[in-house]
Each structure stands twice: as C-alpha cells, then as structure tokens.
C-alpha cells in the first residue's frame, strides 16, 4: 500500500454558482426589484463582517459565459456555518430569481509533499496559517475548476510511491512559482465532500495569466499523465455597490 500524503486543513469552502432568471426578474416592478437587490446587498455586507475578526472571508464574481452569472465564494471555520449561510441566502427574495447551476464543497488544504522535516506545530507557523486561513485578494479576475488525480490501469496516481509523487509535485510546483506575483492560488480538498478530489481557485488582475499557467501545466508530467479536470469558470470581480447596475433592467 502506498503512503498517503498528510494534509493541513484550514477554513471550509463553499463555491455557489447561479444564473439570473432575467425573464422572471424583468416583470417585477422596479420598486420591488430594488428592494430585492437592497436585501441581497445587506445580506452579503453582513456576512462579510467576518473579515474584520479574521474568522472567514468571501468573494463575489460575475461569471463570463452561460455556465453561470454569479459566483459567491464563502470561507468559514466550520462546515455548519456554510450551511447557515446557504440556508439564509435561500430565504432571500432574490433567491427566487437565482437558479443554482453548480456548487463545490471543500476545505482549504496544504499537503506535505514539499514540506521539510520540523518539530514545530505547523498550525502555529505564521506563513502556513496565512495560507490555511487566507485573506482573499479580491483581484479583478477569478478562475475556478475542480480536478482529480487519474487512477486507471495505465496511470494511477495513488499507486505511486511517496518519493515518486514528491518528485512530480516538486516539478509541478516549480511551474507555479513562475507565476508568483501574477496569480494567487488556493487549493481546496474535497475527497469525501464533493464529486472531484480538489478545487483550484486562481486570482489575477490579468485574466490571460489563467490561460498561460493552465496551458504550461499541460506539459508537466503531473498534469499530462495524472490530471483530470472538470468545468472551468472565469469571471470578473463585482462588489455589492455595483448590484444596482448589475440587476438594472431598462
């Protein structure tokens, strides 16, 4: 049996994707529509107060293409807090006009593939804590995709030795480091939580960097032999004070 990688786990993560039902929203009188939007704004501004206490974070993005219109990403210390947010969101009047298109449940994760030996408690390391319990950058653009490590008769990631996986992940990581300062990456583990094994969330002020890093990674052995991917979602940052314009219908 191959040795399993150990993980450090941080905040729980919930990506919620919605399409706006514009046809139904269009027939709502303007004053009622404005009230829906105001209630939605207040809800998100209230949930965002966790930032000041460093007990979570969240981000809102306008997704490009027909897979979704909005992405709401929430990070919280407990899974049940994510349930509470989703339940309270579903009670909002605006929820009647937002059609769920996709969701992803996971937890911020760091593996020990590239970790050196140390006697210190990693959860007390400031650098590690900042990665497990992050302050999201709220860059202009976001890219999210789920992924698996391939396991079939020809290529099975989980049958490789720890040393083989460490070498592959080191080479993989070297490519990622080339994009430091251009892309901020968050890996969330989802084995037992969702249909894929990991979620990858990228932030950048230059949307083209997503294409560049994903393409370059295709030539890396870790990805070429062992990577399997779900749908990609790309979008632009939207703040709650922009909701009036976003939901406006002339």
UniProtKB/Swiss-Prot annotation:
GO molecular function: heme binding; metal ion binding; oxidoreductase activity, acting on the CH-CH group of donors, oxygen as acceptor; peroxidase activity
Top enzyme category: oxidoreductase
Annotated EC: 1.3.98.5
One GO process term, biological-process aspect: heme B biosynthetic process
Residues where Fe-coproporphyrin III binds: 131, 145-149, 172, 185
Assigned keywords, A-Z: Heme, Heme biosynthesis, Iron, Metal-binding, Oxidoreductase
InterPro entries in alphabetical order: CHDC, ChdC/CLD, Dimeric_a/b-barrel
Cofactor descriptive note: Fe-coproporphyrin III acts both as a substrate and a redox cofactor.
SUPFAM superfamilies: Dimeric alpha+beta barrel (SSF54909)
Catalytic reactions of this protein: Fe-coproporphyrin III + 2 H2O2 + 2 H(+) = heme b + 2 CO2 + 4 H2O; Fe-coproporphyrin III + H2O2 + H(+) = harderoheme III + CO2 + 2 H2O; harderoheme III + H2O2 + H(+) = heme b + CO2 + 2 H2O
Active-site residues from the entry: 145
Pathway it works in: Porphyrin-containing compound metabolism; protoheme biosynthesis
Cofactor: Fe-coproporphyrin III
Reported function: Involved in coproporphyrin-dependent heme b biosynthesis. Catalyzes the decarboxylation of Fe-coproporphyrin III (coproheme) to heme b (protoheme IX), the last step of the pathway. The reaction occurs in a stepwise manner with a three-propionate intermediate.
Cross-referenced HAMAP family: Coproheme_decarbox_1
Matching NCBIfam families: PRK12276.1
Similarity comment: family membership: Belongs to the ChdC family. Type 1 subfamily.
The protein, known as: Coproheme decarboxylase
Organism: Staphylococcus aureus (strain JH9)
